[in-house]
């Protein structure tokens, strides 16, 4: 058995990737595995939804992250509409907005979110931006980075470091 000590939790990513690659079992003590951290899962969900509009799990994870005034009742009504009409959550949201079935405040947030997703999809097609640049744009334009920067505490500083580490990992 061996132990590896790191100063900051984001530094575990390279070890984790190497251990996974060679099939070596490992445990993280005093922290969460890199790809299981909320901010990393959020980034991956953004990228998944941008590339696949039918990804309801990704949609649900990020539709109100950061906060966009989209409450649980709105999410529930989107789910119900989706089941009744046999549509994915993104398509249901668009249709509900068109038919004025969303409360005004939530409608603004949901429309803004859908417009961003559409804009990023278009940037991939038209500008051919790579996945690293895309994630940088998503973090800035979605307000995700600003959300973490505005809450000045150690946990959010670590989350920002984790996002930087994810971008580095994507460049490798």
Language model features with spans:
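Conserved phosphoryl-transfer catalytic core
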Residues: 92-94
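Surface-exposed charge patches
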Residues: 17, 21, 80, 137
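Accessory C-terminal helicase-associated subdomains
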Residues: 24, 66, 96-172
């Amino acid at each position: 058995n061996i132990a590896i000590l790191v100063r900051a939790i984001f530094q575990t990513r390279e070890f984790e990737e190497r251990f996974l690659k060679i099939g070596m079992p490992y445990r993280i003590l005093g922290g969460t595995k890199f790809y299981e951290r909320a901010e990393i899962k959020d980034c991956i969900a953004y990228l998944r939804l941008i590339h696949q509009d039918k990804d309801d799990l990704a949609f649900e994870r990020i539709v109100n992250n950061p906060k966009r005034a989209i409450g649980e009742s709105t999410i529930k009504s989107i789910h119900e509409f989706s089941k009744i009409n046999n549509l994915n959550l993104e398509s249901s949201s668009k249709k509900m907005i068109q038919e004025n079935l969303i409360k005004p405040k939530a409608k603004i947030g949901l429309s803004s979110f859908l417009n961003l997703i559409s804009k990023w999809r278009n940037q991939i097609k038209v500008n051919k931006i790579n996945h690293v640049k895309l994630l940088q744009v998503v973090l800035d334009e979605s307000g995700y980075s600003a959300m973490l920067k505005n809450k000045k505490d150690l946990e959010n500083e670590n989350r920002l470091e984790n996002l930087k580490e994810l971008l580095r990992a994507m460049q490798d």
